[in-house]
Design a protein with these regions (language model features):
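Short beta-strand immediately N-terminal to the catalytic nucleophile in serine-hydrolase-like folds
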Residues: 22-24, 49, 176
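Short beta-strand/loop motif that positions the catalytic acidic residue
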Residues: 168-169, 175-177
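Catalytic active-site module of serine/aspartate enzymes centered on a nucleophile-bearing elbow/loop
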Residues: 163, 199-226
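Conserved alpha/beta-hydrolase "acid-adjacent" motif
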Residues: 157, 182-188
């Protein structure tokens, strides 16, 4: 995480921006919140969408416990892991498969990882697979990046973002979250809102991990802050 935050700060300096509005969606909200807590003097406002803490508990929720909502899809996801890796966390096992020297092993693991990604964000009957996963190069790169990050618990101490939320005091901002988000349950943004003085929690009742109504709210909030 230190390197990710340093990259953002280097970009800000390169662009000659003194203070800016930081926006993060999904894992980008983990990065955006962490950046704001470490460089609060450089953040004019902070907008987070589909927030999670990036902690081990949240990662285990997505890779294990969310399977209670999608049992058939999760069983397929889990069963792709060979017996000799079953004692590992699923995210660790998949990272090993994705880095296997055999391209066929890598590709099969990437397909199953992205299939599960599609499953746990599908909260409506008309949910469609993410078309980006049709690209084999993107699919493998995405799965590798996600598992590398998650197996390291986003390089954050447990619940670090919520515990350090007092550093966000004085920074105006909004947390926009779908009530039906099964990937990132509402308790994480609610706890951050409680710990972040002056923040606004916007709950979109009929959407999950993104959607048209949430995008509309994001645009509204960003326009109001600009």
């Amino acid at each position: 995480m230190d390197h990710h935050v340093a990259d953002i700060e280097q970009l800000r300096e390169h662009l000659g921006i003194d203070r800016w509005i930081v926006f993060g969606l999904s894992w980008g909200s983990v990065l955006g919140a962490t950046y704001a807590e470490r460089h609060p003097d450089r953040v004019r406002a902070l907008v987070l969408g589909a927030f999670s803490t990036g902690s081990a508990a949240d990662i285990d929720w997505i890779t294990v416990h969310a399977g209670r909502f999608f049992p058939a899809e999760w069983r397929r996801f889990r069963d792709h892991v060979p017996a000799e890796l079953r004692d590992l966390r699923l995210v660790d096992a998949y990272n090993i498969l994705l880095m296997d020297p055999d391209p066929a092993v890598q590709e099969a693991a990437a397909i199953e990882w992205c299939r599960w990604e599609d499953a746990h964000v599908a909260t409506t009957p008309d949910a469609a697979p993410n078309p980006r996963y049709d690209d084999a190069r993107f699919r493998l790169a995405f799965a590798r990046q996600v598992t590398h990050c998650w197996r390291n618990n986003s390089w954050l101490d447990d619940d670090e973002i919520v515990r350090n939320a007092d550093r966000l005091a004085g920074i105006p901002g909004s947390i926009i979250h779908g009530r039906l988000d099964l990937s990132s349950p509402l308790d994480a943004p609610w706890r951050l809102h409680q710990a972040w003085p002056g923040s606004e929690l916007v709950i979109v009742d009929d959407e999950g991990h993104g959607g048209q109504a949430m995008m509309h709210r994001w645009r509204q909030v960003l326009a109001d802050l600009a």
